[in-house]
Curated annotation (Swiss-Prot):
Its EC number is 2.7.7.18. It catalyses: nicotinate beta-D-ribonucleotide + ATP + H(+) = deamido-NAD(+) + diphosphate. It holds the Pfam family CTP_transf_like. Belongs to the NadD family. SUPFAM superfamilies: Nucleotidylyl transferase. It comes from Chloroherpeton thalassium (strain ATCC 35110 / GB-78). PANTHER family: NICOTINATE-NUCLEOTIDE ADENYLYLTRANSFERASE-RELATED (PTHR39321), PHOSPHOPANTETHEINE ADENYLYLTRANSFERASE (PTHR39321:SF3). InterPro entries: Cyt_trans-like (IPR004821), NadD/NMNAT (IPR005248), Rossmann-like_a/b/a_fold (IPR014729). This is Probable nicotinate-nucleotide adenylyltransferase. GO terms for biological process: NAD biosynthetic process.
Amino acid sequence: MKKIALFGGSFDPPHYGHFALCTLTRELFSPEKIILSISKNPLKGSANAPEAHQLAMAKLMAEELGKTGPVFEVSDWELRRAGFSYTIETLRHFHAIEPNAELLLCIGEDNYQIFEKWKAYQEILQLAHLVVFARSGTQGEQQSSRIIPPERYTWVQLDLPLSSSDLRREIAEGQDWQAKMPSSIAAHIAAHRLYQNEK
């Protein structure tokens, strides 16, 4: 069966941690495509960079990833909708486009831990197989598997020391941050003075 992996997020900004997740997903599951869907998360509030720059940086990320194989694409469907994004609506959208494909929903352990707070999470489990990325050594799988049948998720452990929130702080404080992302994204951030007013 055709597989399509979906990464939802603000990518605010994208960094090499995101790249590692995307390339590992391709290696482990061999999806026909990996969609980077720019989202407005109702549990996290508004993004820091304007939406146009979020989209531009995600496209730069897809271009860099595309150098390793033509698998990656960007969707702005969630951005173009009014209000916050809910994962169930995004999954319904892509399921309608690809009704015969298996959807892989890639999430972090932090979202896995609060999965029961997600809108229509039972339907999410019907529409998609979860791929949960967790830091090595955590016990989150045992803590949260009570609501997710074991056949509906795959637990992947790896170490990702990078985070977008830390990067935004480092940029605002004038620290050395450029090496943590591809040069094209770093150049975009510098040219448009993004995250300069972060506190």
